[in-house]
Design a protein with these regions (language model features):
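Bacterial Sec signal peptide processing site at the extreme N-terminus
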Residues: 15-40, 196
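Amphipathic beta-strand/beta-sheet edge segments enriched in Tyr/Trp
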Residues: 22-26, 146-196
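A short, hydrophobic beta-strand-centered structural micro-motif
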Residues: 53, 57, 75-81, 130-159
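Extracytoplasmic/periplasmic, Sec-exported soluble proteins
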Residues: 38-49, 70, 86-90, 94, ...
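Sec-dependent bacterial lipoprotein signal peptides
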Residues: 1-21
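Short, secretory-pathway propeptide segments and organelle targeting presequences
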Residues: 30, 34, 41-47, 52, ...
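N-terminal segment of the mature soluble domain
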Residues: 52, 56-67, 71-130, 179-185
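A short, terminal or domain-edge coil/loop segment
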Residues: 116-135, 159-177
Length: 196
């Protein structure tokens, strides 16, 4: 009896060991490839929406009007994009995608948001004390933003049994910081059909 129990335990241990030896495969893929494993918001959604809305914003009348009346490129700050969807979406990656598109095109000038602006100011304060006078950056020379972009990410989920439809809507707005006027409003929608 004891020998049978030992044999059983040995076989059980070996079986579990073999099951644990399954190989995990990792493959490097292009960062701009679309891979959708779960049906949730992902990097491809963020990239596509950022590209579409950036192009829409940059090609709208507000930019040309500003250049015509001010004889310079507008300065934009990308502010808060609030996630109101049903899932955790890191809005910061989306905000950075928008900023990258703005900087990449060179059609507008972009200034830092409040968090990073404070870090830059701390560094400038340190320079006043620790850097040589020739290289210390002066106070009062920051570029003031003319426009601020902000928006929301929303979602609607409809499901029955193993099927689910998830609808995402990203709405962005651009406001003139001096007049509070909305100069551009647009949105992008994504709909995903998921079968589990």
């Amino acid at each position: 009896m004891k020998q049978s129990l030992n044999l059983f335990l040995l076989l059980a241990f070996l079986s579990l060991s073999l099951l644990g030896c399954g190989r995990k495969t990792v493959t490097r893929v292009s960062t701009d490839s679309d891979i959708d494993l779960s049906g949730r918001w992902n990097d491809a959604d963020s990239r596509r929406v950022a590209e579409a809305l950036s192009a829409s914003a940059l090609n709208a009348a507000w930019r040309e009007n500003f250049i015509r009346y001010n004889n310079r490129k507008p300065v934009v700050i990308v502010g808060l994009v609030t996630n109101k969807s049903h899932e955790h979406i890191e809005a910061e990656t989306f905000i950075k995608d928008i900023e990258k598109e703005f900087v990449r095109t060179g059609m507008v000038r972009v200034v830092q948001n409040a968090v990073f602006r404070e870090k830059i100011r701390e560094e400038r304060a340190d320079q006043q004390e620790f850097a040589s006078p020739e290289t210390a950056k002066r106070w009062g020379a920051e570029l003031g933003a003319d426009f601020m972009m902000f928006g929301t990410i929303n979602s609607i989920v409809d499901s029955e049994g193993r099927r689910q439809v998830t609808f995402y809507q990203v709405d962005l707005e651009l406001a003139n910081l001096e007049t509070n006027e909305l100069v551009w409003v647009d949105g992008k929608k994504i709909k995903k059909y998921i079968v589990n």
